Every structure is written in C-alpha cells, then in structure tokens.
Amino acid sequence: MWGDKMRYFPIGVFDSGVGGLTVLKRLMEVLPQENYVYFGDTRRVPYGDRSKEEIKAFTKQIMNFLKKKNVKIFVIACNTISAVFEKEGKEIVFNVVEAGVKSAVETTCNKRIGVIGTRRTTEERIYSNKIKEINKSIEVYEVACPELVPLIEKGFYKTESVKRVVIECVKNLKEEKIDTLVLGCTHYPIVIDYIEEALIGENVRIVDPAERLAYDVKEYITRVNMINPNGSGQVQFYLSKMTQSFIEIAKILLEGKINNYNVSIVDITKY
C-alpha cells in the first residue's frame, strides 16, 4: 500500500504535555518493536481552557513538526485535541476519543456512562455525541475537572490536593449510578489510584481509551503491512519546554526509556 521503506519510519505521538506518556506506554507494550517520536507541548499546557481556534493552530504546528520527522502515522494522545480535531490531509491519524467511545459502549451494562475530562473536551460533548451515534439509549454524563491537569503537570500527582479534586469530580457521577467511567484525559491514568479509591464500592468499571487505541494501531499497521520488522523500541522525545515533572513521570511510566540524550527542546511556533 505504501512505499516499503515507510514501515521503518517511527510512529508519531503527541499531547499537550505529560498525559500522552500514558498512551505511549500502552503503544510500547503492544508494539515494542516500533520506534516512536513523542512531542509534548509543555510550554503551552494546559489546552483544556483554550479556544478551539488556538488548539487547532497548535495541532497544525505539531503535526507539521512531526511530518519533518517522517512519522508513518499520527497518534493524538490528547482528548482535548481529539475533541476539536478536523482531518485535512491524507495522513493516517488515530485519536483517543474514538477508542474511548468504542470501549465505553462495549463495557457498559446499565447504559449509564460517566466521562471526566478537561473543560474543552466536556463542552464539546464529543463523547456524548459519538456514543449516541452508536446507541441512542445510552445516557452519558460528562464532568469537567479543570484543576487536575495543571496539578499533574506541576508534579503534584501524589498529593492530597489531587485526591480532593478527584473526589469532587466523581461525586456527581456516582449519584447518576454510572457503571462505566471513561478517563477522558490522558493525564488521568497518572492518578488512577485516587480515582479507583474514590469509586470504591460503586461497581464502576474504568475505561482507559489508550488500551483500545494501542490495539487499533497494531491492527491497522499489521493489516497494511507497515509493522517495523527490526525496530528496537527507541523513543525520541521533543518538548516545547523542559520540565522536571515530565522527566519524573516519564521515568516512572516508561522504565528507563528516557534520558538526557533523547530529550530535545523545540520551538514549535516555527512550524
């Protein structure tokens, strides 16, 4: 389908910051032989309170940058970007929302699904709309948790402040008797322990869209014969600003895949 050499090109993964590392982790578990290029917009995070126009402009810059890195597919590892993304070219693009929607519909038994995400994601009602396209009888309750991403990006992901925010975020969803909760932001798996604790005794199954996404990507590149036959799982990281929390979280999630030699700073506004 594509030129044979493209199978050796890396997979491009991008997010507003550290959240996309949870997606990269899943991809590397499912496709360990692939090489990856990761971009985190750590200078302009969070995206959740930005306008659609800003997010679209930032996304275009990031994708232009990743094209220069010869990525064979793009993985949008950010729900906020996914919620406003409009495909323009012929690029192969996967996003977490599509995967999360499919997983949520397959998971729910009582047809009551909760979604926690950024303000932009929940205001777009992207999960509600796409879930109802599949099954109109499913009720979807979306709650914005705007405080979480800034706290996680600052490195406060194991604090009482985060715990309190999580409890407040899921409180109303528990009252709606949901049986499925979608993590509608890729930062949230980083605080999964607090989320699970807040849901103890509620018999709620948690959906991390990245799990389905990784297998969707694998299925696609296998089908079009684009699996890298001799890759080594290398990752090149690019950030718009160096932050200690990014390095710390990457070391925890990716277990040795990040060091001083594979992290570069890029002025993304030039793209």
Curated annotation (Swiss-Prot):
Molecular function as annotated in GO: glutamate racemase activity
EC category name: isomerase
Keyword Cell wall biogenesis/degradation found: yes
Catalytic activity, reaction form: L-glutamate = D-glutamate
EC code(s) of this entry: 5.1.1.3
Keywords: Cell shape, Cell wall biogenesis/degradation, Isomerase, Peptidoglycan synthesis
One GO BP annotation of this record: cell wall organization
One of the Pfam families matching this protein, by short name: Asp_Glu_race
Keyword DNA damage found: no
Pathway where it operates: Cell wall biogenesis; peptidoglycan biosynthesis
SUPFAM superfamilies from the UniProt entry: Aspartate/glutamate racemase
List of catalytic residues: C78, C185
Binding locations of substrate: D15, S16, Y47, G48, N79, T80, T186, H187
Family: Belongs to the aspartate/glutamate racemases family.
Functional description taken from the UniProt entry: Provides the (R)-glutamate required for cell wall biosynthesis.
Protein name per Swiss-Prot or TrEMBL: Glutamate racemase 3
